Amino acid sequence: MSTENSPTDYATLTQVLQQQGVALTAAEMHGLLSGLLCGGNRDDSWLTLVHDLTNEGMAFSQHLSQPLQVLYGQTRSALEGGEFAFQLLLPGEDDASVFARADALAGWVNHFLLGLGMMQTKLGQVKGDVGESIDDLRNIAQLGYDEDEDQETLAHSLEEVAEYVRMAAMLCHGEFSCSGGPASDTPRLH
């Protein structure tokens, strides 16, 4: 598996997830972790939430837990680094067809929204740019394509949508991670 400083490999993580009986792809798991982080998670509760959502509340084996902790740390560092280093974990164009990549992006977005909703339970009340981005993500999660469509055109469109998703995730992180965001029920002293 990857080390703390090298990026997580999509195919390797997907294989480990399958071996451990977790019915998520690497894209879906990264989307879930990203959603939790962008929703404001700042403690070890993320692992319990992931166990509950993906493994019937049972802890993962060390063989899976360690790579997920590395991925969580890498994702958190990229989001908090302030250098726009955050990237979606999706299969590369050399590793998957444009259709498989579109499916992976839709899966990433679905699980991102799940993680975000776990941390921010009032997403429907969020207004402004962040609210619009969340609405757009809901539409992107329903991403469809026509298999007769020109694959080069679809690949170009997919790149643009993936970049929009990346920016929307960073926007959500900026909104919810520092202050708890408008959907937080955390009391504040004034």
UniProtKB/Swiss-Prot annotation:
NCBIfam families: PRK01736.1, ygfB_yecA. This is UPF0149 protein NT01EI_3357. Gene3D superfamilies: YgfB uncharacterised protein family UPF0149, PF03695 (1.20.120.740). Belongs to the UPF0149 family. InterPro entries: YgfB-like, YgfB-like_sf. GO terms for cellular component: cytosol. HAMAP family: UPF0149 (MF_00346). Pfam families: UPF0149 (PF03695).
